[in-house]
Amino acid sequence: TIINVKCTSPKQCVPACKAAMGTVRAKCINGKCKCYI
């Protein structure tokens, strides 16, 4: 699931994905965070 959080590295997405979806599996794709459940 892509969330509306800008990123330059996957590490920036981990807290955002954890807060949004309760998962720490995250990637940064095209400058946006993508969370995996």
From Swiss-Prot:
Coiled-coil annotated spans: none
Primary residence: secreted
Disulfide topology: 7-28, 13-33, 17-35
Site (Basic residue of the functional dyad): 27
InterPro entries for this protein: Scorpion_toxin-like_sf (IPR036574), Scorpion_toxinS_K_inh (IPR001947)
SUPFAM superfamilies xrefs: Scorpion toxin-like (SSF57095)
Localisation per UniProt entry: Secreted
Tissue specificity note: Expressed by the venom gland.
GO cellular component, one term: extracellular region
GO molecular function: ion channel inhibitor activity; potassium channel regulator activity; toxin activity
Keywords: Disulfide bond, Ion channel impairing toxin, Neurotoxin, Potassium channel impairing toxin, Secreted, Toxin, Voltage-gated potassium channel impairing toxin
Entry-linked Pfam families: Toxin_2
Positions of the record's site feature: Aromatic residue of the functional dyad: 36
Transmembrane residue ranges: none
Extra remark beyond the main annotation: Negative results: does not block hKv1.4/KCNA4, hERG1/KCNH2 and EAG/KCNH1 currents, at 1 uM.
Function, in words: Reversibly blocks hKv1.1/KCNA1 (50% inhibition of current at 1 uM). Seems not to be voltage-dependent.
Family the UniProt entry places it in: Belongs to the short scorpion toxin superfamily. Potassium channel inhibitor family. Alpha-KTx 02 subfamily.
Domain remark from Swiss-Prot or TrEMBL: Has the structural arrangement of an alpha-helix connected to a beta-sheet by disulfide bonds (CSalpha/beta).
Name of the protein: Potassium channel toxin alpha-KTx 2.14
Organism: Heteroctenus garridoi
